[in-house]
Amino acid sequence: MDKLKFGLVSLGCDKNRVDSEIILGSMNRDYEIVNDPREADVILVNTCGFIESAKQESINTILEMNKYKEKYNCKMLIATGCLTQRYGKELKELVPEIDAILGVNDYKSLDDAIEDFFNLGKKDIYCNYSDQSINEGKRIITTGEYSSYVRISEGCNNSCSYCIIPKIRGKYRSRQFENIIDEVRELSENGTKEVILIAQDTTRYGVDLYGRKRLHELLKEMSLIQGIEWIRIMYCYPEEITEELIEEIASNEKVCNYIDMPIQHISDNILKNMFRKTRKSEILDKVEKIRKKVPNIAIRTSLIVGFPGETEGDFNELCDFVKDANINNLGVFRYSREEGTKAALMPMQIADTVKEKREEDIMLIQQQVSKNLNAKKIGKVYKVIVEGFNGDYWYGRNFEMAPEIDGKVFFKSQSEIKVGSFINIKITENLEYDLIGVVYNEFSK
């Protein structure tokens, strides 16, 4: 078989992106990886199946990629990821255009699937539904060499009533401590300066392997690696955040004063029905404890509106929390009724129009909160990692901003700027979510 050109489309979360990077890095054949699907002989779509809108986007993307079989060079279309893990057999019947289907842990079967198709004309499902391994190995980084996601565990042991992820990704499995450190060391040698730790629950790291939580130890060891300047923590469960973790964030200059702590709601009634392990008082106490120890910390959270049984009172309580808590970065999801979850069977399902209105109301409140917080930053100087140039402004992020989901810092400069470098920016103007500034002491001697 001649050398094939291989294209990949990655949908969904940053954990899916890591899977895609491992897929690209693990292929045994000498493929040529291309960015333009018009050039590809083989196109793989790494799907998301978390909520209904993500499932629909995945199917639409698969059908869109099939057009390249009709009009261009593509001869084989492959689907993998959460959607295929959840609906592999049904997907084969629903979308016959797919030539091979792989589950979330089946990337090692990719070469076989391609060989079978081109040599034997075979179309098949390559899903090992009992595989509880962790996708690890060489990666081809797609986020720019200066910033890389590092997954520290796979799966989830929480049983939130709205979430299908444990059934797709399996039980919680921590990666070996040494493997993670080796990966970060290799990333650093290849130019990575910012490491973003991800998992379904980063704060539980180590419990299954070592009998104790070791996230704070992981941070300490990573910070010793030369070249790593920022370490950012995502997906922290409030009840799993330890004193040791807070102390490490406060004392370790390489660990960003940033924590992503999805709480989903603040009403005890809704939290109970979500099967969440924390209640309002515990969440408020945790936020206060973190801020007391790390005064300038940026807190990100995510919320779900329109959960079954969410009354006007529950929603107003959530609105009051958003107004008062001064959360730096916030995302809102409309509840999605997912088959196979406990919440899907609950009474008092909320109409889509109500969900949409509640999402809009929360984001309007947060927009003003964010604008007020940003106004206090005028005149301050921040270390910013440079991400690019949009034709008018250079842009990047300070420690308060995770890539893609938070705001940006925009600035102009008459000097030569290198993407991936750090630069000091003095803030001169604030927007709702973004900041505008100038290079600090650009022309000073």
Swiss-Prot record:
It is an enzyme of class 2 (transferase). GO terms for molecular function: 4 iron, 4 sulfur cluster binding; aspartic acid methylthiotransferase activity; metal ion binding; protein methylthiotransferase activity. [4Fe-4S] cluster 1 binds at residues 13, 48, 82. InterPro entries: Elp3/MiaA/NifB-like_rSAM, Methylthiotransferase, Methylthiotransferase_CS, Methylthiotransferase_N, Methylthiotransferase_N_sf, NA-bd_OB-fold, Ribosomal_uS12_MeSTrfase_RimO, rSAM. This is Ribosomal protein uS12 methylthiotransferase RimO. The gene is rimO. Belongs to the methylthiotransferase family. RimO subfamily. Catalyzes the methylthiolation of an aspartic acid residue of ribosomal protein uS12. Residues 375-441 form the TRAM domain. GO terms for biological process: tRNA modification. [4Fe-4S] cluster 2 binds at residues 156, 160, 163. It comes from Clostridium acetobutylicum (strain ATCC 824 / DSM 792 / JCM 1419 / IAM 19013 / LMG 5710 / NBRC 13948 / NRRL B-527 / VKM B-1787 / 2291 / W). It holds the Pfam family Radical_SAM. It catalyses: L-aspartate(89)-[ribosomal protein uS12]-hydrogen + (sulfur carrier)-SH + AH2 + 2 S-adenosyl-L-methionine = 3-methylsulfanyl-L-aspartate(89)-[ribosomal protein uS12]-hydrogen + (sulfur carrier)-H + 5'-deoxyadenosine + L-methionine + A + S-adenosyl-L-homocysteine + 2 H(+). Keywords: 4Fe-4S, Cytoplasm, Iron, Iron-sulfur, Metal-binding, S-adenosyl-L-methionine, Transferase. The lineage of its organism: Bacteria, Bacillati, Bacillota, Clostridia, Eubacteriales. Binds 2 [4Fe-4S] clusters. One cluster is coordinated with 3 cysteines and an exchangeable S-adenosyl-L-methionine.
